[in-house]
Amino acid sequence: MISQNIRKKSVKLVKSLLVAATLITTSSAPAFATPKVVILVAGYGGSGCPDGSASVTVSPDGQELTLLFDKFIAEGNNAKESRKSCNLSIPIKVPQGFQISFYDADYRGYVSPYTQARLRAEYFFAGRRGPVFQRVFHGETDYNVRDSLATVANVWAACGKSENMRINAAMSARGRGIATVDSFDLAHRGLKYHIKYRACK
């Protein structure tokens, strides 16, 4: 009788452990269902973003990158300062078996009266060509534009590697005033990049 009771208790214990293990596995599965592509940091340089002149912020989940510039200002009435550029290098941590591509980029800035400005941006990975976007603005205007890269080109990094996104942006100005990318009001202007990813084929 004692041995039968022990056997019954053992069976119940095993069943309980199996149920507990199933619950743990079920609750843990979503955490591994969607691997994340994570933005690590950003490096920058150029006449429009000399060292120490930009503020770089990465969101807590690593999905968004924001840059705020202090000196990305082209002067239309100064030939030496009429074009400013900024080259960005953004290391991205890519999960094994996935590729990364650009999704979109938002730009905000200002063009003063009697000024024509041209914003040009190229997006690529090292050793690859990517799409180029150009826009012309006539001052006075506060602009807020988006380069919707997903609708134009799929620029994918190599499978299973951490990659450096590269963005070469330039602002040119003609006329009496200035054209900026993120100037003065940091709460409303800046540059934000988003990303998308897919499984390797």
Task: For the regions a language model picked out, list residue spans one by one.
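Short, surface-exposed beta-strand/strand-loop-strand elements in extracellular ectodomains
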Residues: 115-128
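N-terminal leader/pro-regions and domain N-caps
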Residues: 32-76
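Internal, hydrophobic beta-strand segments that form the core of beta-sheet-rich folds
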Residues: 159-176
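Short, surface-exposed tryptophan/glycine-enriched loops
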Residues: 133-163
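Proprotein-processing/basic-patch segments
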Residues: 173-201
